[in-house]
Amino acid sequence: MKGLLKNEFLTMRRVILLYAGVLLLYYLLGVFGTKMAGVQVFSVFFCTMLVISSFSYGEKSGWNTYVNVLPVSRGQIVMSKYLFALICMAGAAAFGLLIQCAMNMKNGNPVFQDAWVAGMAVMIASLFLSVVLPVLFKVGAEKSRVVLILIFLIPFVVALLAEKAGIQLNLSPERLHSLLPAAGLGTVAVVLLSCAVSMGIYGRKEF
């Protein structure tokens, strides 16, 4: 497992550096702007693209065929993808949280004010990946582009339709903060279910 994770980071190191540069620019915009919340959410979702890119790299390099003759189980291969995604998202969230706390101290606000945003961003991004990763394991990165776009757009379409229908959702910061514990448990359950589904899909796949 450790070797698989190391391979993910070494293979994607140039892309990770590129993403880090882009995120640093956005964090600077957030620091000199008025709100960091939007930047934190964007940075976490932006990092989900890393695992999608890793699938594309694996397909083009022939890694998927090679790794299946190594002394690792298919379950470990699946878990390494999930862990890679979670580590990247957690890293982006932690860095954003650090900047948020520093800004709060500078502005005389409570240190952990709006700290919940980073956690909420990780949970939402994890739910997104819980849907995306089984699709990627099933059909691969190249064939799933349209599906990924649709999955990404569905929440926005639902929100737009709800607004047009006059449905008002109580999504105040206080309400969202109170939902964090339940949302966290639900997210863990969904991620574990997604991982099990991906293992089933990948276990039956032929190379």
Regions found by a protein language model. Give the residues of each.
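Alpha-helix N-cap/helix-start motif at helix boundaries, enriched for small hydrophobics
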Residues: 76-78
